[in-house]
From Swiss-Prot:
GO molecular function, a single term: RNA binding
Alphabetical keyword list: Apoptosis, Developmental protein, mRNA processing, mRNA splicing, mRNA transport, Nucleus, Phosphoprotein, Repeat, RNA-binding, Transport, WD repeat
Name by which UniProt lists this protein: THO complex subunit 6 homolog
Localization annotation: Nucleus; Nucleus speckle
């Protein structure tokens, strides 16, 4: 039996541990800073890394520019979701949401500003919080996940003001219809539910898997991603990625992709989606696949569009998932480079 040649420089235990961590890393969530120049990425080890987009995109960028400017331990379990307000980074893990001041994070001071736990039915419950959604009109935050409820939190007082119940299994994703304001939620039960926040009630239910053109029983009924644009919604997961007219609850376009999709977003006249497989898919609303742009991860879980007006030079699409890398697309048509934990 042949033996591998010994390494010239023996790696210390810490280096071996870090290499193994990177090998098995999943980046679940991303959020752009209010100034548009930094990107936060949260992984399965409870770490949040802050990358400088402005440094990585600079003409003088070096390899070091693609590494985090700071990494800190935020949660005991995975960082499933993150959003940013004009001052704060909010992160969600198992059973709680935490608030961090962007200004302090960037000074490399990583103390949480506050933490909140939604009122769960039993003290033994520690369900994951899969999705966070800001509702600017009422200065609130919606949290949803493993306890099958949507919890609304007042961002000024930190108080939980209501719980919306209707899902029969855990919730994967949230989206906002701003004009109303109404919130859409998608879950493991195969339903997309529409909630009117003014009356705190469910006003519409679409059971996607019951529509023959969308149903894919071999993949299950779960809804893993959704996005909305006025009267239109796109959602996918177990069922096919499909564009819906909300007012009539009608599926209008079924997108021809077999792999379950984990993230979807409207962008200009396109729909961008990603999931199993390394590609970011660009769809016309008609269902035509305009482009498939490969990235460096074998599967994608999160897409983030940096459209902060304060930093037009940092206008990029970033994609992350089953690796330690965040792919950066400066032009939607190709991957320019990758940031790495």
């Amino acid at each position: 039996m042949e033996h591998a040649a010994p390494l010239a420089v023996p790696l210390g235990q810490a280096e071996v541990f870090q290499a193994l961590q990177r090998l098995h890393m999943t980046i679940f969530s991303q959020s752009v800073s209010p100034c548009g120049k930094f990107l936060a990425a949260g992984n399965n080890y409870g770490q949040i890394a802050i990358f400088s987009l402005s440094a990585a995109l600079s003409s003088e960028a070096k390899e070091e520019s693609k590494k985090p400017v700071v990494v800190f331990h935020a949660h005991d379990g995975p960082v499933y979701s993150m959003v940013s307000t004009d001052r704060h980074l909010l992160s969600a893990g198992d059973g709680e949401v935490k608030g961090w001041l962007w200004a302090e994070i960037l000074k490399k001071g990583c103390k949480e500003l506050w933490r909140r736990q939604p009122p769960y039915r039993t003290s033994l419950e520690v369900p994951e919080i899969n999705a966070l959604l800001l509702v600017p009109k009422e200065n609130s935050l919606i949290l949803a996940g493993g306890d099958c409820q949507l919890h609304s939190m007042d961002l000024e007082t930190g108080a939980f003001t209501r719980a919306l119940r209707g899902h029969t299994d855990y919730i994967h994703c949230l989206a906002l219809r701003e004009r109303s304001p109404e919130v859409l939620s998608g879950g493991e039960d195969g339903a997309v539910r529409l909630w009117d926040l003014r009356i705190a009630k469910e006003v519409q239910t679409i059971e996607v898997y019951k529509h023959e053109e969308c149903s894919r029983p071999h993949n299950g009924r779960w809804i893993g991603c959704l996005a909305t644009d006025s009267d239109w919604m796109v959602c996918g997961g177990g069922p096919a990625l499909t564009l819906w007219h909300l007012r009539s609850s009608t599926p209008t376009t079924v997108f021809p992709i077999r792999a379950p999709q984990k993230h979807v977003t409207f962008y200009q006249d396109l729909i961008l989606s990603a999931g199993q497989g390394c590609c970011v898919n660009h769809w016309q609303l008609s269902g035509e696949l305009k482009a498939q742009v490969p990235g460096s991860s074998p599967g994608l879980l999160s897409l983030s569009l940096n459209q902060q007006p304060a930093a037009p030079e940092c206008k990029v699409l970033t994609a992350s998932g089953n690796s330690c890398r965040v792919d950066v697309f400066t032009n939607l048509g190709y991957r320019a480079f990758s940031l790495s934990f």
